Amino acid sequence: MTMYAKNNTSGKDMLSLLEWNKEELTDIIKLAVAMKTNPAHYSHILSGKILGMIFDKPSTRTRVSFEAGILQLGGQAIVMSSKELQIGRGEPIKDTAHVMSEYIDAIMIRTFSHEKVEELAYHAEIPIINGLTDLHHPCQALADLMTIYEWKDQLEGIKLAYIGDGNNVCHSLLLAGAMVGIDIRLAMPKGYEVDETILAKAENLAKQSGGKIFVTEDSKLAVTDADFIYTDVWTSMGQEDENAKRLADFGEKYQVNAELVSGAKPDYHFLHCLPAHREEEVTTEIIDGIHSVIYQQAGNRLHAQKALLAAILEAK
């Protein structure tokens, strides 16, 4: 067990938030805040550790934050794409997982299929971190919770409205919020709802934590008295062929703009995982306005992931 976490999370995968519990999640958030406050104290805790990073999707925040994070903790990173590995030429994931387990201490993978990450974790003898799949984006959710915690000094009872596509970011945000007792409101058009299985699991988590989940097509209803308003792009990577239809289906009704946010609390904060499509899901006025905390949120990817790495590796 790492000296920096109360729970025995050493060696644990982060495939989705479903493998973790409320106490473990809260410990990571608090450790992330401590690391952000006093980074020098933790600058050598992963000395000698190597993080392998595999990318099948383009990345800015995930790559830079993970690579900088492991370096700031005293470790090293090896960055790869599937095209550079034998897995890109047909080597079974099983073989890749076993071989890489002989060389490095953990793998972070950013890819399309969640099943690929699960298969990698099944065969690997080292921790696997999901840097994003089409179904989950747990590391983003850690940064989201950290940002909320920094502003409110609590998580339970916070009113969070998510407006937009029921995508991977929404799935992980929903699970994270339900786990820690957040009042979550989701607003999205028909055909873009969250995965039913994930919603059911989130509802069970909310019952245990005292959280609430409300799903509606009415974005104005969702943001009523909200502490935080969150949105994401309407067209994610790999969905470019659907862009015209998606723009029409979402439209101004689901755009975070001055009219919509007027229903939130006067001191609300705006969240976005980035990259953003200004004047689509959010107006420039809002994303660049005084309520926006998107750069703090993006910066917290670094600190939340450093805490995650410390929790799953044998920190010194």
From Swiss-Prot:
GO terms for biological process: arginine biosynthetic process via ornithine; citrulline biosynthetic process; L-arginine biosynthetic process. It catalyses: carbamoyl phosphate + L-ornithine = L-citrulline + phosphate + H(+). Pathway: Amino-acid biosynthesis; L-arginine biosynthesis; L-arginine from L-ornithine and carbamoyl phosphate: step 1/3. L-ornithine binds at residues 168, 232, 236-237. Its EC number is 2.1.3.3. SUPFAM superfamilies: Aspartate/ornithine carbamoyltransferase (SSF53671). Carbamoyl phosphate binds at residues 59-62, 86, 110, 137-140, 273-274, 301. GO terms for molecular function: amino acid binding; ornithine carbamoyltransferase activity. Keywords: Amino-acid biosynthesis, Arginine biosynthesis, Cytoplasm, Transferase. Its main location: cytoplasm. GO terms for cellular component: cytoplasm. It is found in: Cytoplasm. InterPro entries: Asp/Orn_carbamoyltranf_P-bd (IPR006132), Asp/Orn_carbamoylTrfase (IPR006130), Asp/Orn_carbamoylTrfase_sf (IPR036901), Asp_carbamoyltransf_Asp/Orn-bd (IPR006131), Orn/put_carbamltrans (IPR002292), OTCase_ArgI (IPR024904). PROSITE patterns: CARBAMOYLTRANSFERASE. Reversibly catalyzes the transfer of the carbamoyl group from carbamoyl phosphate (CP) to the N(epsilon) atom of ornithine (ORN) to produce L-citrulline. Belongs to the aspartate/ornithine carbamoyltransferase superfamily. OTCase family. HAMAP family: OTCase (MF_01109). This is Ornithine carbamoyltransferase. It comes from Listeria monocytogenes serovar 1/2a (strain ATCC BAA-679 / EGD-e). The lineage of its organism: Bacteria, Bacillati, Bacillota, Bacilli, Bacillales.
